[in-house]
Swiss-Prot record:
GO biological process assignments: glutamate biosynthetic process; glutamine catabolic process
Subunit structure: Homotetramer.
Residue sites binding substrate per the record: S61, N113, E158, N165, Y189, Y241, V259
Enzymatic class: hydrolase
Pfam families xref list: Glutaminase (PF04960)
SUPFAM superfamilies (UniProt xref): beta-lactamase/transpeptidase-like (SSF56601)
Name by which UniProt lists this protein: Glutaminase
Organism: Alkaliphilus metalliredigens (strain QYMF)
Keyword tags: Hydrolase
Enzyme Commission number(s) of this protein: 3.5.1.2
Gene that produces this protein: glsA
Gene3D superfamilies named among the record's database cross-references: DD-peptidase/beta-lactamase superfamily
PANTHER family xref list: GLUTAMINASE
Length: 305
């Protein structure tokens, strides 16, 4: 499989030039635009990696899937979805527009920034430190990587430039969606987005989802399968920002992207896939990464549709 993956990588590398590095978070603009890597972890225990699969990047919006699972596990679906909706928006991920004009005032889904911030605020813990430790511990379990850490430079950069997220959070407090100290909740959110990962790490998250919430190494049912199905449904409808519909048609795999250049994909009952390519298209998705996943879906018949 490595040979086939390498060929897919090589034939799609030229797409990198059509994208840009993000500039609104200064630290992310320092990424290697030319990096491109794939990692596959399947349910038979096989793992394959080609290209820059060890290239470190911050998880960014891919983290929204993980914190949604933790919040659902902590609070249950009624609590979570009373405060956050289930519908795609068609708007950019950092848009506030529908939050203000649509009634009732709640974020449309957990994959946009407003929804993800609200979800993070639901995670239990007696202190800020405990909540962050729970989030980090959960990520370490799902990636099977006990060494995951927050990239402090990116975290600081997110915090300094996070005024739009701040304004959304204060609006949500005003309408009763968020109750905690807003700066503490935002700090948690900036931390979770700044966790440094590789393709291998996010492929393992994808495999966890593909395995129905069962940890591959231990066989432990960590998260109820109904929550996994919800997360995968959100990945299909909202996971690739406002390119989710096109991605569902052309690729047909539940996936979640992040502006760090990562895409985490999960093929139910088959495999998890991690792709990195920091050069982004105008929607905020890895421009070469999307093409790589499209070719993989075609070659291996991975579409769920």
């Amino acid at each position: 499989m490595n040979e086939q993956l390498q060929k897919i990588l090589d034939t799609n590398r030229h797409h990198i030039q059509g994208g840009q590095l993000p500039t609104y978070i200064p630290e992310l603009s320092k990424a290697n635009k030319e990096a491109l890597g794939i990692y596959v972890a399947d349910l038979d225990g096989n793992e394959y990696g080609v290209g820059d699969y060890e290239y470190p990047f911050t998880i960014q919006s891919i983290s929204k899937v993980v914190t949604l699972l933790l919040a659902l596990s902590d609070r249950g679906e009624k609590y979570v979805f009373d405060k956050v909706g289930m519908e795609p928006t068609g708007d950019p991920f950092n848009s506030m527009m529908k939050l203000e004009v649509v009634r009732p005032s709640k974020p449309f889904n957990p994959m946009i920034n407003a929804g993800a911030i609200a979800v993070t605020s639901m995670i239990k813990g007696d202190s800020q430190k405990e909540r962050l430790e729970r989030i980090l511990g959960f990520f370490r379990q799902l990636t099977e990587n006990p060494n995951l850490q927050v990239n402090q430079s990116v975290y600081r950069s997110e915090k300094i430039t996070g005024d739009r997220n701040r304004s959304m959070a204060y609006f949500m407090k005003d309408v009763g969606i968020m109750q905690n100290d807003i700066e503490s909740d935002l700090d948690l959110y900036f931390n979770q987005c700044s966790i440094e990962v590789t393709c291998k790490d996010i492929a393992k998250i994808g495999r966890f989802l593909a395995n129905g919430g069962v940890l591959f190494e231990t066989g432990q049912q960590l998260i109820d399968e109904k929550y996994i199905k919800m997360a995968e449904a959100f990945m299909v409808t909202c996971g690739m920002y406002n390119a989710s519909g096109e991605f569902a048609i052309k690729v047909g795999i539940p996936a979640k992207s992040g502006v760090g250049g990562g895409i985490m994909a999960s093929v139910p009952k088959k495999m998890g896939i991690g792709v990195v390519g920091p050069s982004l298209d105008e929607k905020g998705n890895s421009i070469a990464g999307v093409r790589v996943l499209q070719k993989m879906a075609e070659d291996y018949g991975l579409s769920i549709f």
